[in-house]
Amino acid sequence: MKADENKAMSSETPNRIRITEYLDLDIDREQWMCNRCNHVLGSARENYKKGCLLHDRDPREVHPALVAATFNFSPDPSWVRIVECYCPRCATQIETEYLPPGHPITHDIEIDIDRLKERLRKGQFIIRGQRLEAVE
């Protein structure tokens, strides 16, 4: 990546909104981005998890049984799966999902980009320090 591109994609740019701890929305480019390394995860009109590396974890590994008994609080892999989503460039863990086996990856964040852009243009919202603020 060229220095100019990296500067343009810096997390300090005024068009970036922090959505979660590790996920940003570049509103002008309509792209999901890792806020640790600025890697583009994909179109903000789609599920950001499509651009992530996914790791299926054994729930017994994540939550080992504390009591050696037939019935304990360790999750049963026939009832739950744990899926971790990572940035493919810097390996930052962006999200973790607990899902029933066979359930598709959830599309948990869907932003009305057109309406958001309209409200930014009208001055109803501003972006300050990567935070979206309503203007009174």
Question: Residue ranges of each PLM-predicted region?
Answer:
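Short metal-coordination and nucleic-acid-contact micro-motifs, chiefly zinc-binding Cys/His arrays
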Residues: 27-30, 80-83, 109
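Internal, hydrophobic beta-strand segments that form the core of beta-sheet-rich folds
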Residues: 88-93, 100
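Short beta-strand-alpha-helix junction that forms the catalytic/metal-binding core
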Residues: 76, 80-88
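Intrinsic disorder/low-complexity detector
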Residues: 1-26, 50-72, 76, 98-136
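Short, structured motif recognition centered on aromatic/hydrophobic residues
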Residues: 31-44, 48, 82-85, 94
